[in-house]
Amino acid sequence: MTRTIDPNTTMAELLQEFPGAQRALFRAYHIGGCASCGFDGAETLASVCARNDNLPVDDVVNTIYAAHEADQKMQVSPGEIAERLRAGEQLPLIDVRSREEWDAVHIEGATFFTQELMQEMMSEWPKDREIIFVCHHGIRSLDAASYFAGHGFQRVRSMTGGIDAWSVEVDPDLSRYHVE
């Protein structure tokens, strides 16, 4: 169940429940993308709205909910991906984690996301090709999927829970890790 957002919700609580909120706030209102328009996790949504041209909190909340709904449509579970791979589907799993994370552990058959791969995808891959992005917990991959969707890719997905969920739900032999 999705948590209700109210004016006193802190930004940390908001981002915990709605990971795409920062992306949505930046896209719609230029909030949270840089030092001059950033916010502190302890600030409430109401205070952030107040210092950004007194934005109506209800409008901002609706923007976050709409973005969250769009994000949910891009999600695909580790179990569904595993089933499809076992059935022989050729799914591009694009891992957007850091090189260190990739070197430590990665899903067999996944491809490490590089600048060169991004250029290839943007210029050569069909816009209707299904692409599944993977990261540690499913947040960076959701940002990547959203970015590619914004550039016209129609079938981008993000693996819910990332490689961490994959290691719990699909492949318990895959090491779990924590970034400090």
Describe each PLM feature range.
Residues 2-32, 38-91, 99-130, 139-180:
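Rhodanese-like catalytic fold shared by cysteine-dependent sulfurtransferases
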Residues 95:
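Phosphate-rich cofactor/ligand-interacting catalytic cores and adjacent structured alpha/beta frameworks
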Residues 134:
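Short, surface-exposed ligand- or partner-binding patches at beta-edge/loop junctions that are enriched
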